[in-house]
UniProtKB/Swiss-Prot annotation:
Keywords: Glycoprotein, Lysosome, Membrane, Transmembrane, Transmembrane helix. The lineage of its organism: Eukaryota, Amoebozoa, Evosea, Eumycetozoa, Dictyostelia. Residues 28-727 are lumenal. This is Lysosome membrane protein 2-B. Heavily glycosylated.
Length: 755
């Protein structure tokens, strides 16, 4: 019997060992599956809501986990005038300003068997305006304008920018004059003089006899009379609708409302309601229908008789239709001729919208043929007035010809004569001075620090809600393009859908090690720095599950939208957060070193100019930590040199789930004026003067995230289950092993004794 007991104990021990192994494997697989489930970025992935990345990390405005606090500090330039005159700036750090920060991915679309996800990342900020908080909607600062900096950089200098603005002003001038609406405006502007003169001429042709004049006007069918006969059907009406007595009164120059008086004609056209009332109150005895008839006739003349009369005195318009039916020629008659089409500048017309006379002929007291004038507004012409390159050529040639009249061969500015080209040079300089420098720059861009290199805003508008007058000039019909604030803060989901970039990430389905990794940034798979750099790296808030548990010393590469690059992280320490073990990772110092591939020439100053449409944006750690102290002196922030507050980026990763359970995200936005120390910038060389090799701090922000207690409890539960699994497994294996070992040993011993 004792042999039977020992034989039975042996397989029982093996069974216990097997059960222990099975528990270990099954529980381990279950835990891993749960971690993966809590990492995969797809809707309805089965994860508990508080750890579901679709809710927690992608966003839900109703989820308090997704309402975070972002704190900003801004830099106020205290000497804006002196800075723009070439002195060193003096900045002052102001703040803090706190915001609730919500982000979510909208327009989400899964594809390629759910392995990839496209979306638009929608971020919103809401200022916390309450007791104990500074109000960013009231505090005002002066700061560098990235939009103006980008425009100057793209143009090549402020001088080049003025040339580009001159070309744009020329284009706007000729567009206004050659638009079909100018014919209407010209007809209205010239009608008082032209039609009143025609009525007077008709009266003169009739021997100053109102009765004869009325007969010619009302009944003649000949268009050879000095005025379009009333019987010629340019309006719906009958000559018999106005009696002879009424007509003669209208032709009598002594009457207050005579049609031979330019002032009256102007009143009829510009104030129809008032004119009608005046006509009805006059002694002419007009009925309401008759008054309407006269005013309709006057209005019809502005688009028929008046334009034809205006162009008929120009030899190039021997057939008036050649010029009245051609908007370009009609406008060029006003621009290129002296005297002009209207006999005066459009500047004299009320609400003309121009700061001075825009006409070439009027300003230069000379004129051009329509063919030559037209060539100046073709961008294919070597000499033209609508491309910056040609404007620059005209100005350079003009300077050389002024110094030496034989320095430029006439063939280079053909088809214009020497005198014509001199007039073009003179006119170009005039437009640059009067329209660009005197109006666009002074009155529209630089006025009251609304635009230009240094601007003035509330802190809130600076960060999220500013527009720039230069952008308004460049894109007059696209308000969405006027935004100049460095951070997006779109409040309307429809606007977000219409304007935000579509990006793509891996969901983790198929390959969990790719979870949340970016495929594109702002719609592109490569970053356009000094060389093409592929978008790659992990999502900062979700590393691949179990990645760190395999090797906590493994390098971590994280792609961040704000830094627009992949950053390498190094393990710093291990610790415990709310009962959960973690590893803390910080940005490697190597990320801040000089790197030609990223146009990075100054340690601890990351260059984003090629990514941000030429805007001179440079990122650093908050308070410029790490940068050479000389830049503190040149920015006037020496009080921050010895600041030792830890504001650096870090992330505490729970190694099994890969989730960032605690972390801090921070960066500072600056601009940098390139050039040699102690010299003035060659970029800012006309409207301002800036010192070279100076960092202008703008603002920094910090966002701290931490797992909630519920999330901690979920992860802690996993660790407790895991600990229980280990305990059960160890017990079963130890007990089973003991039974098998003892029973086997005793069985062998019994056999030996029996022998």
């Amino acid at each position: 019997m004792k042999h039977i007991g020992r034989i039975v104990s042996f397989p029982i021990g093996l069974v216990l060992i097997a059960v222990g192994i099975i528990i270990f494997v099954v529980v381990n697989r279950t835990i891993k599956d749960e971690f993966k489930k809590a990492a995969v970025v797809i809707p309805d992935n089965g994860a508990e809501e508080i750890v579901d990345p679709w809710v927690r990390f992608i966003g839900n405005e109703g989820d308090p986990n997704n309402v975070r606090t972002y704190t900003f500090m801004a830099y106020n330039l205290t000497n804006p005038i002196e800075t723009m005159q070439g002195h060193l700036p003096k900045y002052q750090e102001v703040g803090p300003y706190s915001y609730n920060y919500i982000y979510e991915r909208i327009n989400a679309n899964l594809y390629e068997d759910d392995e990839k996800l496209s979306f638009k990342l929608w971020k919103r900020y809401f200022p916390i305006v309450a007791d104990g908080y500074r109000d960013p909607t009231k505090d005002t600062i002066y700061h560098f304008n990235l939009v103006y900096g980008a425009a100057v950089k793209q143009a090549g200098s402020e001088v080049a920018l003025s040339v580009a603005l001159t070309a744009a002003a020329m284009g706007k001038i000729i567009t206004g004059l050659t638009d079909p609406s100018f014919k209407v405006k010209a007809g209205f502007a010239a009608a008082p003089t032209v039609t009143a003169g025609a009525f007077s001429n008709l009266l003169t042709a009739a021997g100053n006899d109102p009765a004869t004049a009325c007969g010619l006007w009302q009944t003649s069918t000949s268009s050879s009379t000095p005025l379009v006969p009333f019987s010629v059907p340019i309006i719906a009406g009958s000559p018999s609708d106005i009696s002879q007595a009424q007509c003669q009164a209208l032709f009598d120059p002594s009457n207050k409302f005579s049609l031979t008086d330019p002032t009256n004609v102007g009143v009829y056209l510009l104030n129809p309601a008032g004119s009608k009332a005046a006509l009805l109150a006059s002694p002419f005895g007009l009925t309401s229908v008759q008054a309407d008839l006269i005013m309709k006739y006057q209005l019809a003349l502005t688009s028929t008789f008046v334009p034809t009369t205006l162009v008929s005195r120009f030899a190039e318009c021997s057939d008036p239709k050649t010029c009245t039916n051609n908007p370009l020629y009609f406008g060029l008659l006003q621009w290129a001729k002296n005297p002009s089409l209207l006999g005066q500048s459009v500047f004299a017309i009320p609400n003309s919208g121009v700061p001075a006379a825009p006409e070439f002929g009027i300003y230069t007291s000379s004129e051009l043929s329509l063919t030559k004038a037209g060539s100046l507004f073709l961008n294919t012409s070597t000499i033209n007035l609508i491309t910056p390159t040609s404007i620059g050529t005209i100005l350079v040639y003009g300077q050389k010809l002024k110094a030496d009249p034989t320095s430029i061969p006439p063939a280079l500015y053909a088809p214009f004569s020497s005198g014509e080209f001199d007039a073009i040079v003179k006119y170009t300089g005039y437009i640059m001075a009067a329209f660009v420098d005197g109006d666009i720059i002074k009155n529209q861009i630089f006025k009251d620090y609304q635009g230009g290199p240094i601007v003035k805003h509330t802190v809130h508008d600076f960060l999220f809600n500013s527009t720039d007058p230069l952008l308004k000039l460049m894109y007059p019909d696209t308000p969405s393009a006027w935004v100049s604030s460095p951070l997006d803060n779109i409040q309307d989901v429809k606007v977000a859908n219409a304007t935000l970039h579509t990006d793509e990430i891996y969901t983790g389905v198929g390959d969990i090690d790719l979870v949340s990794s970016p495929i594109t940034f702002e719609g592109e798979e490569e970053l356009n720095y000094n060389k093409k750099i592929k978008v790659s790296g992990s999502f900062a808030e979700q590393l691949p599950p179990s990645y760190l548990s395999k090797d906590p010393e493994a390098p971590v590469n994280v792609f961040t939208d704000e830094f627009a690059r992949s950053l390498s992280f190094r393990k710093e320490v291990g610790g415990n957060f709310g009962g959960i073990p973690y590893y803390r990772y910080r940005i490697n110092e190597s990320n801040w070193e000089i790197n030609p591939d990223y146009f990075q020439t100054i340690p601890y100053l990351l260059n984003l100019t090629s990514i941000k449409s030429g805007a001179p944006a440079y990122l650093s750690r908050p308070r410029l930590k790490g940068i050479d102290v000389g830049y503190y002196y040149k920015a006037g922030i020496t009080d921050l040199i010895n600041d030792d507050e830890d504001l650096d980026v870090f992330a505490d990763y729970e190694p099994r789930s890969g989730k960032a359970i605690h972390g801090r995200y921070s960066l500072q936005v600056n601009t940098y004026i390139q050039g040699s120390d102690g010299t003035n910038s060659t970029l800012y060389n006309k409207y301002s003067a800036f010192r070279s090799d100076v960092v202008h701090p703008m603002f920094w922000g910090v966002n701290i995230i931490a797992a909630t207690q519920e999330q901690i409890d979920i992860l802690t539960k996993a660790y407790k289950v895991d600990s229980f699994r280990y305990a059960i497994t160890v017990i079963l294996i130890v007990v089973g092993g003991f039974l098998s070992l003892i029973s086997g040993g005793l069985f062998v011993l019994d056999k030996i004794i029996d022998l």
